[in-house]
Amino acid sequence: MTAPSQVLKIRRPDDWHVHLRDGDMLKTVVPYTSEIYGRAIVMPNLASPITTVDAAIAYRQRILDAVPAGHDFTPLMTCYLTDSLDADELERGFHEGVFTAAKLYPANATTNSSHGVTSVDAIMPVLERMEKLGMPLLVHGEVTHADVDIFDREARFIDTVMEPLRQRLTALKVVFEHITTKDAAQYVRDGSDNLAATITPQHLMFNRNDMLVGGIRPHLYCLPILKRNIHQQALRDLVASGFTRAFLGTDSAPHSRHRKETRCGCAGCFNAPSALGSYAAVFEEMNALAHFEAFCSLNGPQFYGLPVNTGWVELVRDEQQIPENIALADDSLVPFLAGETVRWSVKK
C-alpha cells in the first residue's frame, strides 16, 4: 500500500457483510456497494429468507440486474439456516458455487430473523456437514433470552453457544460477525485459525453515549447495539494491531426514514456510502494506516480461500459532506453520518 499524506491506494476491498434488501430498496442501495467493492457477502434475511439454491440464484440475479454498467461486482450468496433446513440442499448450493457460506441467526435476534435457529442442537447435522465441506458459518452472536440484558447478549453468547459449538466442531470455519465487545475481541484473538471476525465502522467510531446522550440518535441504532467505550476501544485496538483474522464487514443495513424515525424504530445503519472512508479515518486516528489495506482487502480473501481482487481503489483526503437524505421511491434513506463532514472519500 502506498500512503502519501493526501492519498491512500489499496487493493480493491470486499465487504464481508452487507444487507442489500430487495425491490426498490435493492435498486437504490446496490450501486453504493458495487461501485467500491469487488465482492460482498450478501445477507439472506429477506422477508422470505433465502433457504434454497433456486431462491439464492434468483436473488443473485436481482442484485446483478441492479448493478450499474461499468461496475465490476460479484455478490457472494449465503444460506439462511433454519431448524428444518435440508443439509443436502445446502451442500448442493455450496458445490454449485451458489452458496459461499451459511448464516446463523438466533431466532428473533435482528431484522427478519423470526425464522432463525431456536437451538444449535436443532441444526447440528447441518453444521457437521458444513464442517466436512469446509463451508464457513457466519454467526450473529447474540442470545435472545428475555432475561438477558441487551448489552450482555454477545458476551453471554460466547459462553453458552459459541464456545460449546466450537469445542464440538473443532474444524468448522466460523466468522463471528459484527463483534462489539472486548469479550468478543479477546475471544477471536485467542481463537484458532478457523475463527475470524468482521467489524463495522459504527462500532469502531462510536459507543452507546454517542447514541443516547443529549437525545436518541436512531440512525446509530443497530444490532448488536453500540456498547460502552471500553468495548469500542478494544475493537480499535484489535484492528490497529494488524490482527489478520479481523476484516471489513460494514453490516450496511438500510431502512426507510419512516421505519427508523418512529416510536418503534428498526435496527440498522445504512453506511455503504461512507464506510470505506470511515474505516480510513479510524485507522488514521490509531496511527495504523499500515494495516488498513489488509483489513479491507487481504484478510477476508485469505480466510475465505479466495483470490485478492486485481483492481485498486484510491481514497483522497478531501473533506466532503454526507447527504442528509437519499431518495427512495415514496420515502427516503438517511445514510450513516448524514449531514456530517468526512475526511476521507473514495476517488471517483
Swiss-Prot record:
Pathway: Pyrimidine metabolism; UMP biosynthesis via de novo pathway; (S)-dihydroorotate from bicarbonate: step 3/3. The keyword Zinc applies. Zn(2+) 1 binds at residues 17, 19, 103, 251. Its EC number is 3.5.2.3. Substrate binds at residues 19-21, 45, 140, 223, 255, 267. GO terms for cellular component: cytosol. The modification N6-carboxylysine is found at residue 103. Disulfide bonds: none annotated. Catalyzes the reversible cyclization of carbamoyl aspartate to dihydroorotate. This is Dihydroorotase. It comes from Salmonella paratyphi A (strain AKU_12601). The lineage of its organism: Bacteria, Pseudomonadati, Pseudomonadota, Gammaproteobacteria, Enterobacterales.
